[in-house]
A protein has these predicted regions:
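Beta-strand-dominated extracellular/periplasmic modules and repeats
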Residues: 2-300, 322
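Cationic, low-complexity basic patches in intrinsically disordered or flexible, solvent-exposed regions
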Residues: 313-316
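Intrinsic-disorder-associated, low-complexity terminal segments enriched in Asp/Asn/His/Tyr and depleted
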Residues: 307-308
């Protein structure tokens, strides 16, 4: 069956049969995706057995709550980031730290404080080094931003996330912290480690078929928002991890890598309220936020009219220094 016949068949089955109100966008997407799927079936000569096995696979992946993991592992999330980067470039928006994937393990509703937060529940205290994250939220002109919300989440020493790992307390290693009047925040937490896909899971099943591993480097996730600005989704990854530039989710990007140095100065140890030497990351990340979606058309018009010079007024940079113990 050629594409013309495929399109006619889809029109007959999914457009002409409508008897009630139609959501035009949903119809457009379904018709296009079905057309491409049917064409792939023709091009690859997929058998009915292969098609039904595929449907069974997606059923299993959904029941295992791994569809989000699969999206990351096959590069869908990274593609969406690159597409967003391209859109920003076309609009003349540049600077700041790169965005990168959210991943499938965010949970809304983490405890929220102002200025300082402790992220861990103490269950791994003394078993894993402590991490102190000091951050500052600014605009691109260096103005401090009060009231920015910084959401942070990461894995424990076993590479597991609370809620998905039922052995952890709710919201362990998940917190939201609001910046103070001077744009500052501090998070006291534990050193994250990387993780691998469940070895018997549906995502690893596909990766095995592709000859790929399913490992991620150690990393910390962020959402950064401020009133009137678009949310930024990003993360930093840890230098020295064997999977740093071989992340199965393709999340590592230039500008998002933290390098640790040892700190043995007793005064600094005391200032941090610690009892022994630790490591620190001399790292500054500029997280760029853009005006909310509802204002994007206005921003683009302004950019075109003013040669992008005024667009910088609508940008927000987020700077953070990360200290490890």
């Amino acid at each position: 069956m050629n594409r013309q016949n495929i399109d006619a068949l889809i029109q007959k089955m999914n457009v002409d049969t409508a008897t009630g109100p139609v959501d035009a966008r949903t119809q457009q997407i379904v018709v296009r995706l079905l057309g491409d799927l049917f064409q792939a079936i023709e091009d690859l000569d997929l058998s009915q057995t292969e098609i039904w096995k595929g449907l069974e696979y997606f059923t299993d992946a959904g029941q295992a709550n791994e569809l989000g993991l699969l999206a990351a592992g096959l590069g869908l999330e990274h593609y969406l980031d690159l597409r967003a980067d391209e859109a920003d470039a076309k609009a003349g928006i540049s600077g700041g730290t790169p965005r990168t994937i959210e991943g499938p393990l965010y949970v809304a509703g983490a405890p929220e404080t102002v200025g300082f937060t402790r992220m861990d529940d103490g269950s791994e205290e003394g078993k894993i080094p402590t991490l102190i994250i000091d951050g500052t939220v600014k605009d691109t002109e260096g103005n401090l931003i009060e009231g920015a919300k910084v959401e942070i989440w990461h894995a424990n020493s076993l590479g597991n996330y609370s809620f998905f790992d039922k052995s952890q307390s709710d919201f362990n290693l998940r917190r939201s912290v609001i910046t103070t009047a001077d744009g500052q925040y501090t998070a006291l937490t534990t050193m994250p480690v990387g993780y691998g896909c469940p070895p018997q899971g549906t995502t690893q099943f596909v990766l095995d078929k592709l000859g790929r591993h399913g490992n991620r480097p150690s990393h910390v996730h962020y959402f950064v928002t401020a009133p009137g600005f678009r949310k930024l989704t990003t993360q930093f990854n840890i230098e020295g991890d064997q999977y740093l530039w071989d992340d199965f989710a393709f999340a590592t990007r230039d500008g998002l890598v933290a390098t640790a140095v040892d700190v043995t100065d007793e005064a600094e140890i005391e200032r941090r309220g610690l009892t022994g030497a630790f490591s620190t990351f001399n790292l500054t990340l500029n997280w760029l936020l853009i005006k909310m979606v509802r204002r994007q058309l206005t921003l683009i018009v302004v950019a075109l009219a003013l040669n992008y010079s005024e667009v910088q007024r609508f940008q927000l940079a987020f700077c953070t220094e990360i200290s490890w113990v």
